[in-house]
């Protein structure tokens, strides 16, 4: 690749949490969107055509084939959510990870080998933004993620700079 060719990646994590009356995690739902962006020497920027989240991709996201656990992304993300159940937001925040973002907890590693540092941080933020909704005991957290990419190709300015914006709607 020449010095004029550029590549970038945008990772966006979504977390929904349900807290019990004591403020402990009762349920977690996670998802993530990975978007890779490339730019060539003419300034043409190409966006991906597959806008699905990791959960939406299911078996099309081939983690199970390379995982020592032989589990896909959704299974491991759900295992992480189950691990967090019963913990306070402060306990979640203190979850130790290694330099690769993976948990240092052997029990969690037996069911989830993906990097969890970003998911941990998203769950903490979701807990901080949580509002009482009067859920029944045994209620589940539900998460809907929609990605819309109206521009598959962009052209950079004369300096070959492109500005991409990620908009989130945390507060609805």
Label each region the model flagged:
Residues 2-143, 147-172:
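Active-site- and interface-proximal helix/loop "cap" or "latch" segments in soluble metabolic
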């Amino acid at each position: 690749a020449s010095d004029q060719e550029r590549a970038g990646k945008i990772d966006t994590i979504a977390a929904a949490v349900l807290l019990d009356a004591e403020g402990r995690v009762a349920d977690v739902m996670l998802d993530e969107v990975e978007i890779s962006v490339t730019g060539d020497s003419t300034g043409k920027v190409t966006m991906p055509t597959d806008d699905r989240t990791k959960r939406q991709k299911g078996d099309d996201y081939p983690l199970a084939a390379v995982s020592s656990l032989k589990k896909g992304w959704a299974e491991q993300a759900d295992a992480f959510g189950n691990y967090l159940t019963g913990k306070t937001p402060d306990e979640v925040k203190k979850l130790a990870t290694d330099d690769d973002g993976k948990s240092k907890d052997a029990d969690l590693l037996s069911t989830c080998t993906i990097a969890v540092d970003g998911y941990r941080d998203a769950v903490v933020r979701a807990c901080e933004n949580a509002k009482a909704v009067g859920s029944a005991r045994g209620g589940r957290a539900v998460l809907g993620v929609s990605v819309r990419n109206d521009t598959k190709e962009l052209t950079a300015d004369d300096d070959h700079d492109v500005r991409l914006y990620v908009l989130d709607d945390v507060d609805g």
